[in-house]
Amino acid sequence: ALLIGVGPGAACTTRGVLGIGVPQVTATVDAATARDFYHKRTGKYIPIITDGGMNRGGDICKAFACGADAVMIGSSFARAKEAPGRGYHWGMATSHVNLPRGTRIYVGATGSLKEILFGPAKVDDGSQNLMGALKTSMGSLGAANLKQMHDVEIIIAPSIQTEGKIFQVDQRVGMGK
């Protein structure tokens, strides 16, 4: 498997420290394109794991639509009441004396692991019921499985998070937070 993601995680500072990194959607699409080319030439399929920035259901859905076969989730699980960090998250690139490029961040405890994964959601920002978001997105796109998510059409809209959300932004609710 190929792990994709340099610096998009909530606790990671790699992009700032090293000055490298590619936005997560772009990195996943580029890796999936190369993987598919390699698969056609050799018959060998290399699964892609998108790692970093998977905070909301929409982030996970976009990763699969861009070609990921799996995602790694860190800060969302760190927010679970059962998490051993008690509201704190240490990224994969934890602090090191030779090249510090990660930090410990406070993410709080927003719900149980069950609520974060399966709901019911108690917040309106997409950070709970991650599986419900994935199932709804797949249904809306006509994808019966994750492999079919790789074939959906992707359109990049610069203001997709806030487009038409004037009241949410004004009242700081939902996607306006």
What positions do the PLM features span?
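Helix-rich catalytic cores of soluble enzyme domains
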Residues: 1-3, 14, 21
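Non-cysteine beta-strand/loop elements that form the S-adenosyl-L-methionine
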Residues: 1-8, 73-74
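Gly-rich Lys/Arg/Thr-decorated short loops/hinges at beta-loop-alpha junctions or inter-strand turns
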Residues: 6-16
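Alpha/beta catalytic cores of nucleotide-metabolism and tRNA/nucleoside-modifying enzymes
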Residues: 19-50, 55-177
